[in-house]
From Swiss-Prot:
GO terms for cellular component: cytosol. This is Phosphoribosylformylglycinamidine cyclo-ligase. Belongs to the AIR synthase family. It comes from the Bacteria. GO terms for molecular function: ATP binding; phosphoribosylamine-glycine ligase activity; phosphoribosylformylglycinamidine cyclo-ligase activity. SUPFAM superfamilies: PurM C-terminal domain-like, PurM N-terminal domain-like. Keywords: ATP-binding, Cytoplasm, Ligase, Nucleotide-binding, Purine biosynthesis. The keyword Cytoplasm applies. One of its GO terms (biological process) is 'de novo' IMP biosynthetic process. It catalyses: 2-formamido-N(1)-(5-O-phospho-beta-D-ribosyl)acetamidine + ATP = 5-amino-1-(5-phospho-beta-D-ribosyl)imidazole + ADP + phosphate + H(+). InterPro entries: PurM-like_C_dom, PurM-like_C_sf, PurM-like_N, PurM-like_N_sf, PurM_cligase. Pathway: Purine metabolism; IMP biosynthesis via de novo pathway; 5-amino-1-(5-phospho-D-ribosyl)imidazole from N(2)-formyl-N(1)-(5-phospho-D-ribosyl)glycinamide: step 2/2.
Amino acid sequence: MTDKTSLSYKDAGVDIDAGNALVGRIKGVVKKTRRPEVMGGLGGFGALYALPQKYREPVLVSGTDGVGTKLRLAMDLKRHDTIGIDLVAMCVNDLVVQGAEPLFFLDYYATGKLDVDTASAVISGIAEGCLQSGCSLVGGETAEMPGMYHGEDYDVAGFCVGVVEKSEIIDGSKVSDGDVLIALGSSGPHSNGYSLVRKILEVSGCDPQTTELDGKPLADHLLAPTRIYVKSVLELIEKVDVHAIAHLTGGGFWENIPRVLPDNTQAVIDESSWQWPEVFNWLQTAGNVERHEMYRTFNCGVGMIIALPAPEVDKALALLNANGENAWKIGIIKASDSEQRVVIE
């Protein structure tokens, strides 16, 4: 190098032109998510959002999440179009279990070398997730960081803010002996347990793209986007007395259900009330995974569990199934001082 050599940001591995091209590519899909409360357009230093006027005592609810090592599987299989839906789902589903309506979403996309096609596919998926949940994609950060990530590997994180009427917050405090538990079916493993999924693929020597399961490649089952329950659950909350909702994520049945149970109550799950989707049977068999570990790592076909009074069950099931959910009675709440908060029998 001579003294006359002029270095640029691009020489250092950061392509501003590629970043600008990405913004141009995604503007259209982002615009489709816009709610009337959004003030200003994409590209400002901060996103402005006016609270909906229908709330008398609005309480903001926030959440952040990622998609774990499902992202590694998506990168290995070069399938980036649905991982954004997963990202939104993990955040908005956590909000709605508290009764909150998701309002707006932001994303963080970090990579070693920005590939516009890949990033566009991911962010288009994020926009689709926002459409499914009725929230606005108001901004995000795309960080190209050479030396921090290998090649075109990337990571994503999501941030969501919602709102709930103070008097209508769902916190599990109303759960009581005799309440009935309703399950909402999942679309697959959702976004949890993928380090175990990848280990099972490794030890079994299985190629998920050529292995058939239920008439389609195993990869389709494993990369099926996380189901977004927001619109169905918000309508349910509006019409039925819901006592608690648990989103079955990391920790499965054993750890997520107790998060919404008051002291001296126990959830009793009827294992005969549903059949595991085939992908979970395959994972258990291929990995020789014990039953307790399956229920601790995976949702086993159950994305959410809702507690409500017994007289409301028929109405709730009819409403949920009419909205396209696979809903069924999965158990009951019992009074108990046992340390075992969840029983599966």
